[in-house]
Amino acid sequence: NGFGRIGSLVLRATLDRKDVKVVAINDPFIEGEYMAYMFKYDSVHGRYEGDVQGDKHGITINGEQIKTLAMMDPTQIPWGEVGADYVVESTGVFTTVDKCQAHLKGGAKKVVISAPSADAPMFVMGVNADKYDPKQHTVVSNASCTTNCLAPLAKVVNDTFGIKEALMTTVHATTATQKTVDGPSKKDWRGGRGASANIIPSSTGAAKAVGKVIPELNGKLTGMAFRVPTQDVSVVDLTCILEKPAKYEDIMAALKAASEGPMKGILGYTEDDVVSSDFVSDPASSTVDAKAGIMLSPTFVKLVSWYDNEWG
């Protein structure tokens, strides 16, 4: 539900998998022909090379038709009729359990909110996904892109060395909520300034959200963001006071081991001289940059991890 940046890229990601089939897309503001155009041409992730067609009935990708719907009221979306068991709620509007009940009334069995939620259970892959109970959880949140980057990193460090306190800064690429030129933004004055002309300090709930998925870190971690004028890919700076003294090499060894073991495919690790554009379309939730981090003392360390905030 919703075919903006997230909805469009969720569709791209499903085409790489054989165990997921998209049967319908609901967006009241986008007709099938335009939807096909949006899907095929992407300024960040490049042109989709398969065959894409669109008309008033839906879009067809490589011969597979996907029905398009245009319901404003989510209770009117016939998910059951089109055979949709799972709904990705990616409008950014319906982010509570109560609001997502509308999808269940329409015949869906499960709803995944593609954003943080005030009351839906929040799950981050590699961190607390083992707590998911299919019998109990029908509406869940997949948290935010930044939480998905930060939480795996924080989990490994906390499990191995203990985190006494930590501050996070995300240097975050521009997103659709920002303005191309200066404009009114009553709730966030700085957020109303032109995205391409400024580095904009901003708030983020990502660090506090980590306390929801890693309860032992609740109250020990907070953070903020700098919005910067790049199209995509962001980076987390996690500065920690550790419970146990450690060498920087020991911390990197623990993170590398996790990236090759229990968090493989979720947490990445690199010792290359990388920059942000190297992570466009990277599916990892978080990639530790071993060369970018620094340590001041055995209990005071800054860790750096990259993420494609649209695709990871």
From Swiss-Prot:
Provide the primary localization: cytoplasm
Q: What induces it?
A: Induced by sugar addition.
Which residues are responsible for catalysis? 145 (nucleophile)
- GO cellular component terms, A-Z: cytosol
Q: What is its EC number?
A: 1.2.1.12
Which residues does the record give as D-glyceraldehyde 3-phosphate binding sites?
144-146, 175, 204-205, 227
Listed GO biological process terms: glucose metabolic process; glycolytic process
Q: Which CDD domains match?
A: GAPDH_I_C, GAPDH_I_N
Q: Which reaction does it catalyse?
A: D-glyceraldehyde 3-phosphate + phosphate + NAD(+) = (2R)-3-phospho-glyceroyl phosphate + NADH + H(+)
Top-rank EC class of the record's enzyme: oxidoreductase
Q: Where is this site: Activates thiol group during catalysis?
A: 172
Q: Name one Pfam family in it.
A: Gp_dh_C
UniProt: NAD(+) binding residues: 5-6, 27, 309
PANTHER family per the UniProt record, alphabetical:
GLYCERALDEHYDE 3-PHOSPHATE DEHYDROGENASE (PTHR10836), GLYCERALDEHYDE-3-PHOSPHATE DEHYDROGENASE-RELATED (PTHR10836:SF76)
Record note on quaternary structure: Homotetramer.
Q: Which NCBIfam families match?
A: GAPDH-I (TIGR01534)
Q: What does this protein do?
A: Key enzyme in glycolysis that catalyzes the first step of the pathway by converting D-glyceraldehyde 3-phosphate (G3P) into 3-phospho-D-glyceroyl phosphate. Essential for the maintenance of cellular ATP levels and carbohydrate metabolism.
Q: What else is known?
A: Algae contain three forms of GAPDH: two cytosolic forms which participate in glycolysis and one chloroplastic form which participates in photosynthesis. These three forms are encoded by distinct genes.
- Specify the protein name: Glyceraldehyde-3-phosphate dehydrogenase, cytosolic
| Organism of origin | Scenedesmus vacuolatus (Green alga)
**UniProt gene name:** GapC
